[in-house]
């Protein structure tokens, strides 16, 4: 039996946004008849993409082709976009990448005049709006460039056959030498750093003298050194750094703990 415990009490929105890239495109098709999407795997089913093309034809009388690509690491996605190899219309990164993209002027404002969804923007939860606008840059309100698609938390998935419930109540279980070679971590700088720095400040968090948000955004030399120290201590326990194969390893008992989304 597997069980999931929410650990990182931080909202991590996943956002849709429009890009201002002018990458190369070698095709005889008119570019305006192609919708290019860059997304995480498993976020949109193939049938939805097919249905959208039919819906678009029904609404406009025009055909559209969807070019759909996926990524599994935020930084790989950002690097590809920065190099200008693709002119994506829509991408779906995590929130901290949106902040970087705004700083580098990689985005275009979203046309919020949704003809068939007039109430969408007005009905976005105020909390989500607030989280998005925390990413704003001078003169650039983030909600002009990003619309929330999903949000979630990071936590621990564990196999009850090997891990007692009482053990999986703290990040400390990841550093337990009993589970050497049986722990999976996300192949994500942000999540690896966050896990280490939160664990390092467990006492301060419990006392309420610091918040998770403050820790996640602390990139001082002292914080970086501390995170590095704890990640090096964690290394013997790691079975792998994964983005999408964690569930398979867990079901085959090759890993017992998975720091996951």
Task: Outline where the language-model segments fall.
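Short, low-complexity disordered leader/linker segments with a strong preference
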Residues: 1-34
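Short N-terminal micro-motifs specific to bacterial/archaeal maturation
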Residues: 15, 68, 164-165, 256
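Early extracytoplasmic/lumenal segment of secretory-pathway proteins
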Residues: 24-104
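Short, well-ordered beta-to-alpha junction loops that form the rim of enzyme active sites
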Residues: 40, 95, 188-189, 260-261
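Extracytoplasmic ligand-binding site segments that recognize negatively charged/polar headgroups
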Residues: 43-46, 102-249, 254
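Short, glycine/acidic-rich beta->alpha junctions
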Residues: 72-73, 166, 260
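Paired acidic/hydrophobic, glycine-rich loop segments that form the ligand-binding mouth/hinge
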Residues: 88-93, 239-240, 256-261
